[in-house]
């Protein structure tokens, strides 16, 4: 069985030395170091060496991240939870404030403030459009790939706003740094739109309530 599986892996080009593969069901996550007809050796991220039979990769699903590296884009899929009680219509004074504030002035440039049907937008609508504009204008985002900012199903913890896009740098460390920078900026924008980001009460919050 192992020999046949090794031949199948080779003929179907399912993996090769240097590929990053992941099989959560078996705790496998690392770089392929050696491929033979009877064994596959994988260097895990903690530098331990995992040895598995080829038939394991034929009989069970696994992820090969090499296609992601070749595509030129690495996905960011993050969401923030908006306190639903902070959602409100955006009046003219509020819109003007956003158009003149240093942090939102450029993001608001050209952003519509009401729908084609004449329905006035809320602060969340404007926030999502500005976040989308921020992503669309960012030089380190892969603009050839899908990008969107959307609402998910409301939950007991608030309204999830999801950012979905791809960075142009697929290297792990650089990707994580950019993800941190962009998400921190997106979260810092929220209070300027009078949006409260929900988080579970901390010990300090509970002590404050008790007083």
What do the predicted segments below correspond to?
Residues 1-6:
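Short, structured beta-strand/loop micro-motifs enriched in basic residues and often containing a Trp
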Residues 11-115, 125:
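Soluble accessory domains appended to multi-pass membrane transport proteins
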Residues 100-211:
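Long, non-transmembrane cytosolic or organellar matrix-exposed soluble domains/tails
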């Amino acid at each position: 069985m192992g020999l046949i599986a090794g031949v199948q892996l080779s003929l179907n080009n399912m993996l090769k030395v240097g590929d990053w593969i992941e099989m959560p069901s078996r705790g496998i996550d690392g770089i392929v170091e050696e491929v033979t007809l009877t064994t596959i050796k994988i260097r895990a991220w903690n530098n331990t060496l995992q040895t598995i039979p080829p038939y394991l990769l034929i009989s069970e699903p696994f992820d090969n991240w090499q296609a992601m590296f070749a595509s030129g884009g690495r996905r960011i899929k993050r969401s923030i939870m908006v306190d639903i009680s902070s959602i409100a219509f955006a009046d003219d004074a509020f819109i003007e404030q956003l158009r003149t504030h240093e942090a939102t002035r450029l993001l608001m440039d050209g952003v519509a403030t009401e729908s084609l049907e004449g329905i006035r937008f809320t602060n969340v609508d404007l926030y999502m459009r500005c976040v989308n504009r921020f992503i669309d204008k960012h030089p380190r985002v892969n603009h050839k790939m899908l990008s969107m900012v959307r609402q998910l199903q409301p939950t007991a913890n608030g309204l999830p706003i999801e950012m979905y896009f791809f960075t142009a740098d697929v290297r792990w460390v650089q990707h994580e740094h950019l993800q941190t920078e962009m998400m921190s900026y997106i979260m810092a924008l929220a209070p300027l739109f009078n949006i409260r980001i929900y988080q579970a009460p901390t010990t300090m919050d509970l002590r404050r309530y008790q007083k």
